[in-house]
A protein has these predicted regions:
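Bacterial N-terminal signal peptides that target proteins for export
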Residues: 1-11
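Cyclophilin-like peptidyl-prolyl cis-trans isomerases
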Residues: 12, 20-249
Length: 249
């Protein structure tokens, strides 16, 4: 009799233990995972700072941020010519090594409410191309919708070389036809406006008082020049549809 009672007690204890353990196990499986209390470390993506061109002229300094991400060929060409690290040929065909192309060149064409144009070693806008022509680089999200755009002049698609222009106002009619490779700051736009309102020869829009580029310094990793404003209040009705081409016009 005692053996039977002992056996019954043991079985009861085993059943109770199984029931309790089963509840605990079932509960732990159904419970949601506890959120981690470890602090999340933010991931920082490195963004390379854009180079800046500081253009010293006889009437003041211009500062323009370059866009190598939008126009890598154009920016590399401009930097190479500005610093003399790229070979080029002068108007008589002599190859230049280690000589900055833009030093002592003039802004040969300036038009009020439009732009100033330079970068031709011949100083006329129709000199021979100092470097081989290269293709346009046009980004759909980079437009002539603000003043101060720095872009290449051309004689049609894919004829960029050394000549460039800086806009005084928004020039939406140029969208899609020219390589924008930089943005100049507000002080530069003010200086551009001063230049475009100089007295010019009506035959070629060249200032009677020469505006010369003394030197261009490239500062790597500088700050970004912000657009000088929004679209112009009135269109540049006196300006031609496009900046003058280099050698083909």
């Amino acid at each position: 009799m005692r053996a039977l009672m002992r056996k019954t007690l043991v079985i009861g204890l085993l059943i109770s233990a199984s029931f309790v353990f089963g509840q605990a196990t079932s509960g732990s499986q159904a419970a949601p995972a506890k959120p981690s209390t470890a602090a999340k470390v933010p991931v920082h993506t490195a963004v390379a700072a854009k180079p800046t061109a500081i253009i010293d002229t006889t009437v003041g300094k211009m500062t323009c941020t370059l866009f190598p991400d939008k126009a890598p060929i154009g920016v590399a060409n401009f930097i190479g010519l500005a610093t003399g690290t790229k070979e080029w040929k002068n108007p008589v065909g002599t190859t230049k090594h280690g000589v900055p192309l833009y030093d002592n060149t003039i802004f040969h064409r300036v038009i009020p409410e439009f732009m100033i144009q330079g970068g031709d070693p011949a100083g006329t806008g129709s000199g021979p191309d100092p470097v081989p022509q290269f293709k346009n680089e046009v980004s759909p999200d980079l437009l002539f919708d603000v003043p101060g755009r720095l872009a290449y002049a051309n004689a049609g698609p894919n004829t960029n070389s050394s000549q460039f222009f800086i806009t005084e106002v928004a020039t939406l009619h140029l969208n899609g036809g020219y390589t924008i490779f930089g943005q100049c700051d507000e002080a530069t736009v003010t200086l551009v406006k001063q230049i475009t309102h100089m007295a010019t020869d009506p035959r070629n829009d060249r200032p009677f008082r020469a505006v010369k580029i003394l030197h261009i310094t490239i500062v790597k990793g500088a700050g970004t020049a912000h657009p000088a404003g929004t679209a112009a209040k009135k269109p540049a009705t006196a300006a031609p549809a496009k900046p003058a081409a280099s050698s083909n016009q």
